[in-house]
A protein has these predicted regions:
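A short-motif feature that recognizes glycine-rich, charge-decorated loops
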Residues: 73-109
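Short beta-strand segments
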Residues: 61, 83-87, 134-139
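Short, cysteine-centered beta-strand-loop-beta hairpins and adjacent loop/turn segments enriched
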Residues: 55-57, 81
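Bacterial N-terminal signal peptides that target proteins for export
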Residues: 1-7
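A short, structured beta-strand/loop element
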Residues: 59, 63-76, 121-123
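Bacterial N-terminal signal peptides
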Residues: 7-15
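Short, well-ordered, aromatic-rich surface patches in folded extracellular/luminal domains
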Residues: 19-55, 93, 104-174
Length: 174
């Protein structure tokens, strides 16, 4: 009987890592991952991903797709191009990427995505989109080394890269 509180505490501690991190809301002033002025303006509709660093040479970048078809790529480290690069594609690109993000449920606060064990030093994919109020953004972190996130992370990143046609900008030159 005396062990019941201890067992309950242990069960809670093991359950915490298994639950997914909930999406956060960031106001416009905090809407840039790199600091400074965000690449989006209040009222704009966008979806975006950002690849984070890892123990190796994972590309570090941000990739935004806007409702009007604008694409903005920011290469930071281990990318084919560094700095800010822009291109214009059709609005269909935004629609397809928005659909992919919504279907992944990465930004759904009610989603029950189970996160299993995680490998060390794997990159984190940040998934973002404008919030309904138009003045802030929704953001979620997906660790590519965690069970439950690995496939979703890989699929979302591939979808963004394929639809925005930025492979040459992303792949480092040899």
């Amino acid at each position: 009987m005396r062990n019941v509180p201890i067992l309950a505490l242990v069960a809670i501690l093991f359950a915490l890592p298994a639950s997914a991190e909930k999406p956060t809301v960031r106001p416009y002033a905090a809407g840039s991952l790199s600091g400074g002025i965000p690449l989006w303006n209040p009222g704009e509709k966008f979806v975006a991903i950002a690849g984070g660093s890892c123990a190796g040479t994972c590309p570090v970048y941000e990739l935004y797709a806007f409702e009007d078809g604008r694409i903005i790529f920011v290469g930071k480290k281990y990318t084919g191009k560094t700095g800010v690069w822009k291109k214009q594609l059709t609005p269909e690109v935004y629609a397809e990427l928005l659909t992919a993000v919504v279907h992944s449920r990465a930004l759904d606060p009610d989603a029950k995505i189970k996160r299993g064990t995680c490998l060390k030093d794997r990159s984190v994919l940040t998934v973002m989109r404008n919030a309904p109020d138009g003045q802030s953004m929704l953001m979620a972190l997906l660790n590519s080394g965690c069970d439950g996130y690995a496939d979703m992370t890989r699929e979302l990143e591939k979808t963004f890269i394929d639809w925005t046609e930025i492979t040459p900008w992303l792949a480092p030159t040899k």
